């Protein structure tokens, strides 16, 4: 079972057509944010934003996957039940209208390399 814990319907495309629409349900998990203005660039505030603990995320349940924002998924890399829209589909103006897959978030390439 997949639950959508974002504000927007998640539209899944398959073979160029809408395959499934997963409507939002339940509270939307968010990371606590802290912003500190550290200056201005051309009159635009320049801030340092830190993301903290995740709020409003249900406990993990066997067989249940949760679609969440990439920030939430990144904050909890050990939660293998968290998914994000992947392989995005865009309209002619470049707006995101759906995705072709759901993905777990993982990091690579952040290690220190010796050339």
State each model region's role.
Residues 1-13:
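Hydrophobic/aromatic-rich, well-ordered segments within soluble, folded domains that form packed cores
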């Amino acid at each position: 079972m997949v639950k959508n814990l974002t504000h927007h319907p998640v539209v899944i495309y398959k073979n160029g057509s809408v395959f499934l629409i997963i409507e939002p349900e339940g509270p939307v998990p968010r990371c606590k944010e802290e912003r500190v203005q550290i200056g201005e660039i051309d009159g635009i505030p320049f801030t340092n934003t830190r993301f903290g603990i995740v709020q409003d995320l249900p406990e993990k349940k066997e067989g249940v996957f949760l679609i969440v924002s990439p920030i939430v998924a990144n904050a909890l890399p050990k939660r293998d039940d968290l998914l994000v829209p992947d392989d995005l589909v865009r309209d002619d103006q470049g707006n995101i209208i759906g995705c072709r897959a759901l993905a777990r978030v993982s990091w690579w390439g952040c290690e220190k390399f010796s050339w």
